[in-house]
């Protein structure tokens, strides 16, 4: 396998799935929180869903269980990750047409229709190139469509410390450099792509190596200090829309969601 990102994630399906199983660790809390916040930000969307780096499919599955999406295209560059997502979604989702595509997101082209919601979670650290990625995602949006984008933020001191201490080791282990972004980087990339930030959610205390030192204590701190993390957290999840939609009410119902409600 020539792509280093695909090769790295081929080893991780079981580890990745385990992060979404509730346990007393900071990592479990982090992934459960990411799932919850993504579902909140997607609350006004319905119709056609694209997850452009689905991993093992837990967040995709949670969104599809809402019953608001008639079709989902599930993309991942790793065959093992995509197979795991296929097994999960095929077993648990019965009212949505599912399509599974192994592809690099930059090379992915939809077969025809555009999307009402695009998920981009856990991706940009591994691929960077926001100046190319965001316009590509925007080009696949239906009218009223939105993007949910997640990143770890270098505005957070703990993130900067982890970057300084692990960058060389991560490069040797993965075979590629992790990309890091600040809030300003995200805002500038969105502006360049003609996207506006409709809403933002912050989470994660981001205590460096917290789970290595004491997972239970890290979990307790994450649980008890969620309010602080919602303002200053290490992770940012953004709801994006083309600039013409940016000034809409944050929870405005998308055209696809309006059509869905009309049929109920």
Model region roles, listed by residue range:
Residues 119:
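A conserved beta-strand element that flanks and buttresses the S-adenosyl-L-methionine
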Residues 168-185:
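Acceptor-substrate binding/catalytic loop of class I
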Residues 131-143:
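A short glycine-rich, Lys/Arg-flanked "PGG" loop and its adjoining helix->strand segment in the class I
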Residues 122-123:
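Short catalytic micro-motifs in class I SAM-dependent methyltransferases
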Residues 162-170, 188, 199-264:
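A C-terminal cap/extension of S-adenosyl-L-methionine-dependent methyltransferases
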Residues 1-43, 148-170, 221-222:
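Conserved class I S-adenosyl-L-methionine
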Residues 56-107:
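Class I SAM-dependent methyltransferase SAM/SAH-binding core
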């Amino acid at each position: 396998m020539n792509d280093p990102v695909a090769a790295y994630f081929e080893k991780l399906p079981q580890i990745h799935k385990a992060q979404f199983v509730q346990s007393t660790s900071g990592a479990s809390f982090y992934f459960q929180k990411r799932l919850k916040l993504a579902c909140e930000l997607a609350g006004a969307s319905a119709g056609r869903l694209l997850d452009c780096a689905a991993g093992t499919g837990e967040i995709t599955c949670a969104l599809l269980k809402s019953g608001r999406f008639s079709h989902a295209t599930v993309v991942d560059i790793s065959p093992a990750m995509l197979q795991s997502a296929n097994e999960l979604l095929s077993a648990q989702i019965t009212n949505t047409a599912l399509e599974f595509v192994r592809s690099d997101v930059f090379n992915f082209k939809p077969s025809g229709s555009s999307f009402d919601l695009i998920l981009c979670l856990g991706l940009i650290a591994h691929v960077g190139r926001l100046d190319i990625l965001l316009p590509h995602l925007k080009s696949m949006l239906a009218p009223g469509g939105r993007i949910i984008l997640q990143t770890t933020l270098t505005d957070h001191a703990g993130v900067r410390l982890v970057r300084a201490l692990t960058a060389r080791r991560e490069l040797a282990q993965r075979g590629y450099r992790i990309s890091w972004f600040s809030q300003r980087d995200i805002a500038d990339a969105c502006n360049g792509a003609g996207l506006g930030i409709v809403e933002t959610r912050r989470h994660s205390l981001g205590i460096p190596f917290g789970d290595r030192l004491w997972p239970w204590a890290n979990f307790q701190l994450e649980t008890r200090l969620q309010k602080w993390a919602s303002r200053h957290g290490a992770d940012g999840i953004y709801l994006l829309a083309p600039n013409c939609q940016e000034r809409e009410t944050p929870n405005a119902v998308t055209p696809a969601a309006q059509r869905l409600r009309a049929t109920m």
